[in-house]
Regions:
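Plant-biased recognition of short, low-complexity, intrinsically disordered N-terminal tails
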Residues: 1-28, 37
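Aromatic-enriched hydrophobic runs in primary sequence
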Residues: 3, 62, 115-117, 209-214
Length: 225
């Protein structure tokens, strides 16, 4: 049997593989703070790319690169083997650039993703979660589509079965078929918070302009800034 080609593609075939990417963050408390931590650091966090149910993805993922905030030492971290994750401590949220490299025989370009490092609780029970110092889980589901894969990659993919998503999410199952609705709720909550912040800022500007106008009316000129 001839060796599968790493350039010739299997026409009319599409194969997907699900992954999740994101972070978990845990508050640093007096009880778990170590002496080597900077005093301003408030959380321990880990950003990762992994299988939906922690299954091995290295049969199609060759390398993962995480680009952190420039204030971190060696801000670009490259992992050539699982677990594809980076753990750090810090105090602020920022965007992490993630680049996923596929196996050479795939002939595919790297996939670039962005994840906003999330340290603080969100959602309807965020206040309770904050009071109880619960870990924050902020992951996103992504389906990687191999469109007309090379013969070699087709053999790799079909030799490793994709996981089947459970119908419903439970305490142990983070992603399931009903997760999309939960993601939509989360996005709606984030949009609501942004709109509330914009409205609060608008009201402050109106109040400031009103105060300046009243001062000008009383003194005949604007105060120096």
């Amino acid at each position: 049997m001839p060796t599968p080609s790493s350039t010739k593609r299997v026409k009319g075939v599409q194969i997907y593989r699900p992954i999740v990417y994101g972070n978990i963050a845990t508050p640093i408390t007096k009880e778990n703070r170590t002496s080597n931590l900077p005093p301003e650091h408030t959380h321990r966090w880990t950003v990762s790319v992994k299988g939906v149910y922690d299954e091995d993805i290295s049969y199609f993922v060759k390398r993962v690169q995480f680009k952190l905030h420039e204030t971190y030492t060696n801000a670009t971290r490259t992992l050539d083997a699982p677990p594809f994750e980076v753990s750090e401590t810090g105090w602020g949220e920022f965007d992490i650039h993630i680049k996923i490299f596929f196996r050479t025989e795939s002939g595919e370009k790297p996939l670039q993703l962005y994840h906003h490092l999330t340290l603080h609780p969100f959602g309807p029970d965020k206040e309770i979660a904050k009071e109880q110092n619960r870990p924050v889980h902020a992951y996103q589901y992504e389906e990687i589509l191999f469109n007309e894969p090379t013969e070699a990659m087709y053999e790799v993919l079909t030799s490793n079965k994709a996981p089947e998503l459970a119908p419903k999410r439970t305490g142990k199952i983070m992603y399931a078929q009903d997760t999309e609705g939960e993601e939509e709720d989360r996005l709606a909550e984030a949009i609501k918070q942004v709109q509330e912040l914009k409205e609060e800022t608008r009201k402050k500007l109106i109040d400031k302009e009103k105060a300046l106008a009243e001062m000008k009316a009383a003194t005949g000129k604007y105060p120096k800034s």
